[in-house]
Amino acid sequence: MSVINCEEVKRDEFHTEKYYESYNIFGAHIVTEDEMRGVRFTVWAPHAKAMSVVGDFNEWDYEQHKMLQVTEEGIWSLFIPHIEEREIYKYAIETMAGDVIFKADPYAVYAEVRPNTASVVFDIKGYEWNDKNWSRKKKKKSVYKEAMTVYELHFGSWKKKEDGTLYSYREMAEELIPYVVEHQFTHIEIMPLVEHPYDRSWGYQGTGYYAATSRFGTPYDLMHFVDECHKYGIGVILDWVPGHFCKDAHGLYLFDGTPTYEYKDKDVQENPVWGTVNFDLGKREVRNFLISNALFWMRYFHIDGFRVDAVANMLYWNKEGQEQSNEHAVSFLRELNEAVFAEDEDFLMTAEDSTAWPLVTAPTYEGGLGFNYKWNMGWMNDVLKYMECAPEYRKYIHDKMTFSLLYTYSENFILPLSHDEVVHGKKSLLNKMPGDYWDKFAQLRLLYGYFFTHPGKKLLFMGGEFGQFDEWKDLEDLDWNLHDFEMHRYMHDYFKELIALYKRSKPLWQLDHSREGFQWIDANNNEQSIFSFIRQGDKQEDALVVVCNFTKATYENYKVGVPDFEYYNEILNSDAEQYGGSGQVNKKRLKTIQEPYHNQTAHVEITIPPFGVSILRPVKTRKGSKKQDGSKTKVRSNVTSRGKR
């Protein structure tokens, strides 16, 4: 990709038209002009009175390297010869009020390590990728009809060195990737890696959208990390925040002394919940900045997906007492998704949206926002509220566990057990569970069993896989020493077996987005808090029966209606002794009894374990048996309507 000479740029291409390669115009680019090697600096500052480039090379003297205004709308540019890579710099901006302010480059691809805030000249074009095989394999499979397990993590607190310092991108490739492969996760989702000044913002309050944070190394180091992930078959999803940004003095806020990237109207500019300001998504230059940024991460870092943060905050104005939709944001999100899928039709665009906004994952040509996945926040909130309730009272909120099936096919959903639910006093997943020590582990195993058998792709935050007891501490690493304790080892073994079972069981993912893939057996047993259902694959014989018991009671000879196969085997029981359970399992092959039950033509009698999930698989189809009514009903699949764009 060549750097475009700013003096040749038609102003309409950036100021009034869709222009998604703005990173080729703006920023600091190492070039040769008039046979001299140096750096061309270009920036947009529409209300600046004067602009300069400052750095160690001119002792930060803003009188030395004055920039030239090349468009009336405020593009400034300057070529400085003999500057080399790794020079640090900022823009000195004389405002209309006569003040001089110093700003980092909005398009810088590298920055100083915090607490320093200058931008760094860096040639990002030289990395040699080795992931062609990954790209080919990705195109051969449709994620909609495949298993998808996402490991969400915070790069700075997954694991730290003995002296408390951070692992680099390259070191994390050596530490993290084998762990992810061992657990059979298909993707990792990393909390924001854009440059940000404050560690405890977790990256959600950025200053450098084009700069991979230097906390962990150079852009090439991050490219190496992604390359290694692809080598081992792991997709990489990044958290991305196009809705708001931080107010630190060196960043985008009041960039030229006036609202530039943010709304001018204070009522909609400020975001009081986070202490940030909202991007002006109605401004063409801002849209080009953000959409170019998304494509930049795709093209230069080979990212496989974005989890778009705080979509609800974008969709609605945050004026007090108002629920009015923000049409700027709606049209921006549609434009963003159209641009992303034009670049890569296999990309993952996931909306973190807690509202009931319709058609989030429908294509824009059907009136949708154009994402292909959405976090199921409703499922997460309902299920965790149910699990935190004392078991004897769960029967009174039975609908918390069934309500999601009324809407689960309205969108393409990911089920998130995310970082938001294990921080700020909310407790870890394990510690949310009521009861004594044994009860907590049993119920977490039960929760995971329900999680992996409910329709929708899966996402788990780091530490959940071995039952982290304390909630997430963002300045510390995970409690890896918990592996010294037997119950945590049992939990870890159970989770690995459960995820392996999920991946090899087509009924648990093949029809995730089709009503054909799920059928209740009994959704109404609130008195015993027992739920049973069928997960179905493309073929009739690809079926699993799932029974979940959310109380501590054990039931012998419990009748469960099942599709008419001759035998069933129990392929997983969360109460097995090897997982730390009491051993109430069904070891023998279960022969079906030819008596109707639960609206099925046959049933089996099983032992229901305390706080347990039991998964049954048919062994042999009864000769001459008829297909169960409703087991393969013809319903328009969301995969067809939302999968292709």
UniProtKB/Swiss-Prot annotation:
SMART domains: Aamy. One of its GO terms (cellular component) is cytosol. The keyword Transmembrane does not apply. Pathway: Glycan biosynthesis; glycogen biosynthesis. InterPro entries: A-amylase/branching_C, Branching_enzy, GlgB, GlgB_N_E_set_prok, Glyco_hydro_13_cat_dom, Glyco_hydro_13_N, Glyco_hydro_b, Glycoside_hydrolase_SF. Residues 636-645 have a biased composition (Polar residues). It comes from the Bacteria. GO terms for biological process: glycogen biosynthetic process. Disulfide bonds: none annotated. The active site is at D309 (nucleophile), E352 (proton donor). SUPFAM superfamilies: (Trans)glycosidases, Glycosyl hydrolase domain. Monomer. PANTHER family: 1,4-ALPHA-GLUCAN-BRANCHING ENZYME (PTHR43651:SF3). Catalyzes the formation of the alpha-1,6-glucosidic linkages in glycogen by scission of a 1,4-alpha-linked oligosaccharide from growing alpha-1,4-glucan chains and the subsequent attachment of the oligosaccharide to the alpha-1,6 position. This is 1,4-alpha-glucan branching enzyme GlgB. The gene is glgB.
